[in-house]
Amino acid sequence: FLMVECAITDAGGHGNKPEVTVQGTLQVDWAVKSAVEFARKHNNTLVMVTADHETGLLTCGFTNDPPGKLVMDYATTSHTAEPVRFFAYVTARTAHVLHRTFAA
């Protein structure tokens, strides 16, 4: 069992600093890539990725004038009730049905 946490994305949300949030996201991406590479070599490994909460409610969009300029803005400096994503990388050997009473 290995758990990896990246507090950088949380700090970026609390501080309303998109550049910090992006840096943390890139670090998580690197960690996930490493875990998936390991799982591909060791087919009894399951990789799960999620977050414990969302912070800042970052929104992104594009302007009309000038066209296509990226705009990023936060709605808060606190944790939000927004749902977070859950991803899994499953090999054929680790794929099986888990009765819902055993899933948290």
List PLM regions with ranges:
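A post-motif C-terminal structural segment
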Residues: 1-104
